[in-house]
């Protein structure tokens, strides 16, 4: 199976005017498909042309000049301690017997001349090198084997166009050999590894994107989901990581977040580290829903790992929140506070769905007697966005029930199934001739836009939606039966490059011609937890996340807002 290091496509508005003399446009991404950085090198690097979906290096008139590109294989190039071991290229915390192996390198090139490929250590020592003669004509794939045992500390992979050559490059890949562990386990493994690449043990936080510097823009909600996914990955019947590692992650993150300044108890959505202190990132908010996601995650992880003291401290954090200060005139809780920690945001959690449910449950932990106002448009997610109907079920089993909930009268399981049916039908109805309809892709949800420079929310209620966020496939996977249907879809996605070994792409257009390879922390969290629930259901394993929810008296008491008769033994049964 091939994992792109980088496919050199560029997204730009076709009406954009290119200034005379421009040789390189900014790629719509500034990162590799591995979630790392890249750059240019050589005395003729400024002659490299990148104006379309290929790199062009014309050196036929420069017999003494060379130029090319380097790509970090693990972390940022400036982080020498992060390297790739070709015998186990996923993060080293993942068990060796579950890791893939890198056994080949492939480059797609055209033109005439000589091309050199090198793999180097962090110290710049050449660990592997090959010369490729490009003999003219159209693009061709050049595949070269590598010995994984000789590449245990690889830091960069570099291609260089040699003097006197005219060569074009459209992509660079690593050939992977994967253990035979089953499609359901593979989906969780790849999704968890993607999330783990976003995590920094140095800070205790998950980066919003894997390729950015640790501490520059970290996400609190995804950090909580990472801790929970790690607790799930450490369960004996899964065994991706050790229980000791999961406990260390839990303890480190709890300590790191415990040092944050809050706003009336609310945690920041995003944080950054400056002068050794981590605090809210300017221009972002103290967020009710992101606090809820983090705190639900940490409470469940503490119970799963037998760290009751942590679980109790998480409950205490919730009880210290000043919920009356967050309440809007209509009775709903606000989305939070501005970064000054004082100014209340005017919009509140009143739309029906998983986000509002988690916020309400958080308040009920603090005040068991509170009765929030009814949600707006019960049973109907805003815009028909997929993730809204599934978020709550990443944490709690109760919403697998078709009993009308006591708060809004919603039959959650039916609503979730109806959403899945609408998502699956949308492409064939709106885009019947598309690749998405042909391959059975779906996922009108939320995430980065197609350019990777802004947030996008789609949904089945909107016409002509042409951007798919496939995290919804894994979030809703446990709803589909038989499980083999999901398996076949995952196989098709793997074949089309939408679910490579590094995890699902962030988004893809309905025609299948454009996708965003960004490794983002939030959707990686959604994917990992969704894949875990799918794995346990497909194999009939105990779902440790759901069992922890059932064992928590605080969560059981809070859940009576929706299901007064639900006990710890029958939730979601």
Question: Residue spans of the language-model regions?
Answer:
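Beta-rich carbohydrate-recognition modules and glycan-binding surfaces
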Residues: 1-3, 7-179
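Ser/Thr/Asn(+Pro)-rich, low-complexity disordered segments
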Residues: 1-22, 30, 54, 173-573
């Amino acid at each position: 199976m091939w994992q792109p290091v980088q496919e050199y496509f560029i997204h730009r508005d076709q009406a954009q005017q290119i200034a005379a003399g421009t040789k390189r446009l900014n790629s719509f991404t500034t990162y590799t498909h591995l979630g790392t950085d890249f750059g240019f090198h050589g005395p003729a690097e400024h002659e490299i042309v990148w104006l379309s979906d290929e790199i062009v290096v014309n050196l036929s008139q420069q017999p003494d000049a060379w130029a090319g590109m380097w790509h970090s294989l693990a972390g940022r190039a400036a982080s020498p301690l992060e390297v790739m071991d070709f015998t186990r290229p996923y993060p080293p915390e993942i068990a060796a017997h579950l890791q893939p192996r890198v056994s080949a390198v492939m480059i797609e090139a055209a033109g005439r001349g000589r091309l050199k490929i090198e793999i180097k250590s962090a110290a710049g020592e050449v660990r592997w090198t090959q010369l490729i003669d490009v003999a003219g004509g159209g693009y061709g794939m050049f595949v070269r084997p590598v010995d994984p045992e000789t590449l245990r500390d690889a830091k960069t992979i570099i291609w260089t166009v040699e003097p006197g050559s005219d060569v074009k490059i459209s992509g660079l890949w690593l050939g992977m050999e994967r253990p035979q562990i089953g499609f359901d386990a593979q989906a969780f493994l790849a999704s968890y590894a993607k999330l783990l690449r976003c995590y920094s043990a140095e800070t205790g936080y998950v980066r919003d994107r894997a390729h950015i510097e640790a501490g520059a823009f970290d996400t609190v909600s995804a950090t909580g989901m990472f801790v929970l996914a790690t607790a799930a990955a450490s369960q004996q019947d899964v065994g991706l990581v050790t229980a000791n590692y999961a406990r260390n992650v839990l303890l480190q993150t709890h300590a790191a977040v415990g040092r944050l300044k809050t706003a009336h108890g609310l945690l920041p959505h995003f944080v950054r580290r400056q002068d050794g202190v981590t605090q809210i990132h300017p221009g972002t908010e103290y967020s009710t829903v992101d606090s809820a996601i983090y705190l639900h995650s940490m409470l469940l992880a503490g119970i799963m790992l037998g760290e009751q003291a942590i679980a109790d401290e998480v409950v205490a954090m919730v009880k210290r929140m000043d919920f009356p200060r967050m309440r809007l005139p209509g009775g709903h809780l606000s989305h939070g506070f501005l970064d000054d920690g004082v100014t209340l945001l005017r919009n509140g959690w009143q739309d029906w769905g998983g986000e509002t449910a988690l916020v309400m449950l958080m308040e009920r932990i603090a005040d068991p007697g509170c009765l929030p106002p009814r949600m707006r448009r019960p049973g109907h997610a805003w815009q028909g966005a997929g993730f809204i109907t599934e978020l709550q079920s990443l944490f709690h089993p109760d919403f697998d029930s078709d009993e009308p909930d006591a708060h809004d009268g919603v039959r959650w399981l039916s609503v979730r199934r109806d959403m899945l049916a609408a998502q699956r039908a949308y492409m064939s109805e709106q885009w019947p001739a598309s690749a998405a309809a042909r391959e059975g892709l779906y996922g009108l949800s939320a995430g980065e836009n197609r350019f990777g420079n802004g947030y996008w929310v789609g949904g089945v209620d909107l016409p002509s939606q042409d951007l798919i966020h496939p995290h919804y496939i894994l979030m809703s996977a446990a709803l589909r039966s038989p499980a083999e249907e999901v398996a076949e879809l995952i196989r098709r996605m793997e074949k089309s490059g939408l679910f490579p070994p590094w995890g699902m792409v962030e988004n893809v257009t309905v025609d299948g011609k454009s996708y965003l390879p960004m490794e983002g922390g939030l959707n990686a969290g959604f994917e990992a937890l969704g894949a875990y629930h799918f794995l346990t259901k497909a194999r009939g394993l105990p779902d440790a996340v759901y069992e922890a929810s059932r064992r928590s008296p605080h969560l059981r008491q809070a859940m009576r807002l929706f299901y007064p008769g639900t006990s710890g033994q029958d939730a979601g049964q």
